[in-house]
C-alpha cells in the first residue's frame, strides 16, 4: 500500500502553519506550538483525520458519488488537476465562478456551449469561417475550457467538495453549505474549521504537502471504485524531530 507516514508529511512541511499573529483561535486544538513566530501543526492529529477523509471518500466513490476537487491557488492547481483527472473526478483549478453550485442551471448552459464549440472545432468548422469570426470563437472556447473544462462531465451537483485552502475558496465552501453538500477541507492555522465537515489540519501553501493530501484522496477514490481496502495513511506514529526547512522560511515571508 502507498501509505503516508509522519515523516513524509514532515519532510513536505505539512506541519508549518502561518505566522502566529495571523492565527485563527478556532484552530488551537490542532496546533502543537510555535517556532520562530510560526505555528506548528500537530501532525499526530492530522494523520488520523486524513485517514478519516480517505475512508469517507472511498465509501462515496464505491457508491458512484461525485466529489468535486477545488484548488485555484498556485500551490494547488497542478495537483488538483492531475489527481482529479487520475481518479475521474470533476475539478476547478482556475477560478471559482460565483454561482457554480447555487446557480448550476445557468452554469450548465455554459457547459453546453463549451461542448458545442469543441464539437465545431473537432469537425473543422472553424476553418470554414472568416478569420475574425474563427478567432472570436476560439477565444470563447479557450475561456470556457479554462473555467469549466474540469466540470464539463460532472452531470449535476457533486455529492461532496474537496477543498484546498478553505479561506481562499470561501465562496465555494459557502455555496456548498447553502446546498448542504458535505465539505472536506485542508485547513491551515489562519482559517476556521467551522462549517467544514471533514477537516485536514495542515499547511496549504506547500506544493509538496498539498500534493500529498490530494494524492491520498485520489488514491482512496480509486480504491473505492475498485472496492479495495482503504489504508492510505500510516498509523505508525514514529517520533520524528521537527526541524526547520524552506517551508518555514516561505511562511515567515508573509
From Swiss-Prot:
Gene Ontology terms describing biological process: translation
UniProt superkingdom: Bacteria
Entry annotated with the keyword Nucleotidyltransferase: no
Annotated InterPro entries: Ribosomal_uS2 (IPR001865), Ribosomal_uS2_bac/mit/plastid (IPR005706), Ribosomal_uS2_CS (IPR018130), Ribosomal_uS2_flav_dom_sf (IPR023591)
Cellular component GO terms, alphabetical: cytosolic small ribosomal subunit
Keywords assigned by UniProt, alphabetized: Ribonucleoprotein, Ribosomal protein
ATP-binding is among the record's keywords: no
Similarity-based family: Belongs to the universal ribosomal protein uS2 family.
NCBIfam families named among the record's database cross-references: rpsB_bact (TIGR01011)
Name of the protein this chain belongs to: Small ribosomal subunit protein uS2
Organism whose genome encodes this protein: Legionella pneumophila subsp. pneumophila (strain Philadelphia 1 / ATCC 33152 / DSM 7513)
Lineage of origin: Bacteria, Pseudomonadati, Pseudomonadota, Gammaproteobacteria, Legionellales
Gene designation: rpsB
Amino acid at each position: 500500500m502507498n501509505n503516508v507516514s509522519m515523516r513524509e508529511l514532515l519532510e513536505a512541511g505539512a506541519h508549518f502553519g502561518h505566522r502566529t499573529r495571523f492565527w485563527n483561535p478556532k484552530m488551537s486544538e490542532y496546533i502543537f506550538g510555535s517556532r520562530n513566530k510560526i505555528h506548528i501543526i500537530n501532525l499526530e492529529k492530522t494523520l488520523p483525520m486524513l485517514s478519516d477523509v480517505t475512508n469517507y471518500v472511498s465509501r462515496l466513490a464505491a457508491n458512484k458519488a461525485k466529489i468535486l476537487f477545488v484548488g485555484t491557488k498556485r500551490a494547488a492547481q497542478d495537483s488538483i488537476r492531475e489527481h482529479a483527472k487520475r481518479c475521474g473526478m470533476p475539478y476547478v483549478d482556475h477560478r471559482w465562478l460565483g454561482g457554480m453550485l447555487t446557480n448550476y442551471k445557468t452554469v450548465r448552459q455554459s457547459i453546453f456551449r463549451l461542448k458545442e464549440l469543441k464539437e465545431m472545432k473537432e469537425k473543422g468548422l472553424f476553418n470554414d469561417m472568416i478569420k475574425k469570426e474563427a478567432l472570436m470563437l476560439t477565444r470563447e472556447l479557450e475561456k470556457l475550457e479554462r473555467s469549466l473544462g474540469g466540470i464539463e462531465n460532472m452531470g449535476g451537483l457533486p455529492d461532496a467538495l474537496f477543498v484546498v485552502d478553505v479561506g481562499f475558496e470561501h465562496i465555494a465552501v459557502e455555496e456548498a453549505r447553502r446546498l448542504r453538500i458535505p465539505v472536506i477541507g485542508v485547513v491551515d492555522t489562519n482559517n476556521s474549521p467551522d462549517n467544514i465537515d471533514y477537516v485536514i489540519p495542515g499547511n496549504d501553501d506547500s506544493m509538496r504537502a498539498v500534493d500529498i493530501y490530494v494524492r491520498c484522496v485520489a488514491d482512496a477514490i480509486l480504491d473505492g471504485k475498485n472496492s479495495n481496502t482503504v489504508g492510505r495513511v500510516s498509523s505508525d506514529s514514529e517520533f520524528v524531530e521537527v526541524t526547520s526547512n524552506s517551508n518555514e522560511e516561505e511562511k515567515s515571508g508573509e
